[in-house]
């Protein structure tokens, strides 16, 4: 039975904590937890434990917080736990080859895409921005490459027209634990069927940046609408007005052709703020000026109508 496997869990954020919680709830034997060191957070920059550490300590599990797993003494921490398998979910540290080979069944990772599509740091956001019809999770055997290991199990889910990275994150945080528990059972039973990734289908999900989230009006309205959903809740798509950043929370596409230059404000009314793009019109519905809460376009127009005079251009 898979419950007899000795499991090391390595993860840091809430996404990882949900997987650890599922392992514990289903009776798995977690013999140690690795998570990143406490980090300063909040206005007071007080040291805060990761969600994984909080859960592990609540459950009385041994917690290890090395800055790196490269030093020999830190690798020894892993070796001494004599694990059958190490489960890695959004840990944030590189596992050296020596660590990958320590557990009897190796190390497995939960990745937030249908590999080999979207290897890398931001698979949820990139799948949304690209307009993919579906995404999912892949449980894979880890090797020294970046998300290059053999695939053990996949679960998929559709991407809807309303999904943001936040909602998709929640969907995958439900799927991931299901796939993980199934995979552990298959590893324990000897029924897992590793599948080599097709290198011809590989795409890369590069890390997001705040500058990348700046709205580029030369893109199509459809691309920008997906970008706004992909970058919500972080880093949030934004535009600049009078030197101030204004976040965009929600927009829609108006399928009407326009000859106006990209960035030109066409209309500003209770239906929204309509802006010309490289292809089509983007209707801004919910915005957030610096230092304010998110508000409807109508509410923003009531206080800042001078920002959105038809004929003016947003840059």
Swiss-Prot record:
It catalyses: L-methionyl-tRNA(fMet) + (6R)-10-formyltetrahydrofolate = N-formyl-L-methionyl-tRNA(fMet) + (6S)-5,6,7,8-tetrahydrofolate + H(+). (6S)-5,6,7,8-tetrahydrofolate binds at residues 113-116. GO terms for biological process: charged-tRNA amino acid modification; conversion of methionyl-tRNA to N-formyl-methionyl-tRNA. Its EC number is 2.1.2.9. It is an enzyme of class 2 (transferase). Residues 210-315 are annotated as: C-terminal domain. Keywords: Protein biosynthesis, Transferase. Residues 2-189 are annotated as: N-terminal domain. GO terms for cellular component: cytosol. GO terms for molecular function: methionyl-tRNA formyltransferase activity. HAMAP family: Formyl_trans. Belongs to the Fmt family. PANTHER family: METHIONYL-TRNA FORMYLTRANSFERASE (PTHR11138), METHIONYL-TRNA FORMYLTRANSFERASE, MITOCHONDRIAL (PTHR11138:SF5). Composed of an N- and a C-terminal domain. The N-terminal domain carries the tetrahydrofolate (THF)-binding site and the C-terminal domain is presumably involved in positioning the Met-tRNA substrate for the formylation reaction. Attaches a formyl group to the free amino group of methionyl-tRNA(fMet). The formyl group appears to play a dual role in the initiator identity of N-formylmethionyl-tRNA by promoting its recognition by IF2 and preventing the misappropriation of this tRNA by the elongation apparatus. Monomer. This is Methionyl-tRNA formyltransferase. The lineage of its organism: Bacteria, Pseudomonadati, Pseudomonadota, Gammaproteobacteria, Enterobacterales. The gene is fmt.
